UniProtKB/Swiss-Prot annotation:
PANTHER family: UVRABC SYSTEM PROTEIN C, UVRC/OXIDOREDUCTASE. The gene is uvrC. This is UvrABC system protein C. Residues 204-239 form the UVR domain. GO terms for molecular function: DNA binding; excinuclease ABC activity.
């Protein structure tokens, strides 16, 4: 029992109602969140002579304070528990580190519906199909749908302001509902119905309707229309033959589990209408000594309850592990979905095959992850030795990217003991410096990054500066000038100078801004981890710079025209549907834009053409 916490006095005040409890350490940090049907009984179990596990024993030693929140029901407690876990990320809870919502396909409720990728809460009116494992899978499906059923995928701002069809119409990927007379209302509605049926897994219904339409067109001697529908039928058949998985209209998620060397992998297989939409592996953060049942229980709860607004819940969830609170979880999910959701742990037939597939994928992904992590750990151990440090828990690396000094972007990437922490990668738009002054750019990003309060765990052990001796000297000056409460002398600052011809393996490391640096052997594991973090930083900076440059270019041509201020630029781009349609527009089309006279339209036309 913790001598900093009076458990007996605390327990005498606790109710026996359902609720959620938060445990804090001496610094006021939440270290564990739990829920209970009976708060008094559950909390008392932590302070017995025998607590049951090493993890619980360590947890109790660190308790300095406990807060409780009483709820009406156990289901309410379960939801609140997972909200608190997401909010506080306590170190003794199993944590699902990637809880992003899955991308969906959105079919809008407009008079001429459009297809789009959607991620997040379902606020827009329309229908949602999915989930898909990643945005690539969604875009691939949208590209396929464009070929099969050419309904629009453009933004409403573009659609409303077109006076002639775009390139998608010219190549047969859109029916062109933006221009009157190109497609009838009935034909467009029919294609939207096909999309709806196809995304709902009703491929055969789509084929039957298309075949019927082809036969009717043939009987009416409309052979050109019949041939077009025939080609559409063949395209749909080719796709459905590739996608077919089972004869059942299964609508379920299948979760396979693998556990080895203190690491867990949960592989989720998404099956909708009997088709595998994709799958994804998760590696939750597991505190030492955690039971496997707790890992699975917490993962399933966080996976569905924390993202309930964003996720499409299946009718059934298959697991290869019996959950201790299966009924409660199923009840909570059913309540959220407004329909019954089952959780099965002993399926038969096709479902058992799905589960075996998920389990195999989990084991394979875990083996790969352990192998990669072993390599990362070896490289970090070697780097720790090379830098003469006791340990490295966190590293950060900075790089600058610009084109002739314009649209300068700085990047910061973060590695921990397990490699890249992509959720903590950041970009900084650099302003107010002399264009092309990389030293000033680096000074600005370092001041913005470190000139504020930092948590102990956020203070890096090593900071890499891409740029060699000059940049390192400037970084040291910045750190000397910092007036902060945290230990600014903790990070080791290292400059990385690129090798001759910028070849990998010829980098030089500088620890002081004068004198000779050191070059590690090209086969050194320590050098490999430095190259990894440096390359990630470089790529992150370049990507950010290109995005910023593209954004500026979209409006820079208009900014040079006298008489076209910010408001007119906005109206022009909105009315025309973007810069490219404006570049292709005639003087007469530009003059139709509200607030643009014939004379100004000619000026805009001539400026954009020349």
């Amino acid at each position: 029992m913790s001598d900093r916490f009076d458990a007996k006095a605390f327990l005498s005040t606790v109710t026996s109602q359902p609720g959620v409890y938060r445990m804090y350490d001496a610094t006021g940090t939440v270290i564990y969140v739990g829920k209970a049907k009976d708060l008094k009984k559950r909390l008392a179990s932590y302070f017995r002579q025998q607590v049951g596990s090493r993890k619980t024993e360590t947890l109790v030693k660190n308790i300095a304070q406990i807060d409780v929140t009483v709820t009406h029901t156990e289901t309410e407690a379960l939801l609140l528990e997972h909200n608190y876990i997401k909010l506080y990320q306590p170190r003794y809870n199993v944590l699902l580190r990637d809880d992003k919502s899955y991308p969906l396909i959105f079919l809008s409720a407009d008079s001429h519906p459009r297809l789009a990728v959607h991620r997040g809460a379902k606020h827009a009116k329309g229908e949602y199909f999915g989930p898909f494992p990643n945005s690539y899978a969604v875009r691939e499906t949208l590209a396929l749908l464009q070929k099969l059923f050419p309904i629009r995928q453009c933004e409403n701002s573009v659609y409303r302001n077109r006076s002639r069809p775009c390139l998608q119409y010219q190549i047969g990927r859109c029916l062109g509902p933006c221009v009157a007379g190109l497609v009838s209302e009935d034909e467009y509605r029919q294609q939207v119905d096909y999309v709806r049926l196809f995304l709902s897994g009703k491929d055969q219904q789509v084929l039957h309707q298309l075949i019927e339409r082809m036969e009717n067109a043939s009987k009416a001697l409309n052979f050109e229309e019949a041939a077009r529908i025939r080609d559409q039928i063949q395209a749909v058949r080719r796709v459905t033959e590739r996608q077919f998985v089972s004869g059942n209209s299964d609508d379920l998620d299948v979760i396979g589990v693998a556990f080895e060397a203190g690491m867990a992998c949960l592989h989720v297989l998404f099956i909708r209408q009997g088709k595998v939409l994709g799958s994804r592996s998760y590696f939750p953060k597991v505190p030492g000594g955690t039971e496997m049942s707790e890992v699975v229980q917490t993962f399933v709860g966080q996976f569905y309850l924390q993202g309930s607004q964003m996720r499409t819940l299946p009718a059934e969830i298959l697991l290869d592990f019996t959950l201790p609170e299966k009924e409660l979880l199923a009840e909570s999910l059913s309540e959220l979905a407004g329909r019954k959701i089952q959780i099965q742990s002993k399926p038969r037939g096709d479902r058992a095959r799905y589960l075996k597939l998920a389990r195999t994928n989990a084991a394979t992904a875990l083996t790969t992850k352990l192998s990669q992590q072993s390599t990362i750990h070896q490289r970090l151990a070697e780097l720790t030795k090379v830098l003469n440090l006791s340990e490295i828990n966190r590293m950060e690396c900075f790089d600058i990217s610009h084109t002739m000094g314009e649209q300068t972007v700085a990047s910061c990437v973060v590695f921990d003991a397990n490699g890249p922490l992509r959720s903590e990668y950041r970009r900084y738009n650099i302003t107010g410096i002399t264009p092309g002054d990389d030293y000033a750019a680096m000074a600005q990003v370092l001041k913005r990054r470190y000139g504020k309060a930092l948590e102990e765990k956020k203070i890096p052990d090593v900071i890499f500066i891409d740029g060699g001796k000059g940049q390192l000297g400037m970084a040291i000056d910045v750190f000397n000038s910092l007036n902060v409460s945290w230990d600014k002398n903790k990070p080791l600052l290292i400059g990385i100078a690129k090798g001759a011809d910028r070849k990998a393996g010829l980098e030089t490391l500088f620890f002081v801004p004068e004198g000779e640096g050191i070059a590690l052997p090209s086969d050194s594991p320590a050098l490999h981890v430095i190259q990894h973090i440096r390359d990630d930083s470089h790529n992150h900076a370049i990507t950010g710079h290109r995005q910023r440059r593209a954004k500026v270019r979209n409006t820079s041509a208009l900014e040079l025209i006298d008489g076209v201020g910010p408001k007119r630029r906005q109206v022009l781009l909105k009315y025309m549907g973007g810069l490219q349609p404006l570049l292709n527009a005639s003087v007469e089309e530009i003059a139709k834009v509200p607030g643009i006279s014939q004379a100004l339209a000619e000026k805009i036309y001539n400026a954009l053409k020349h």
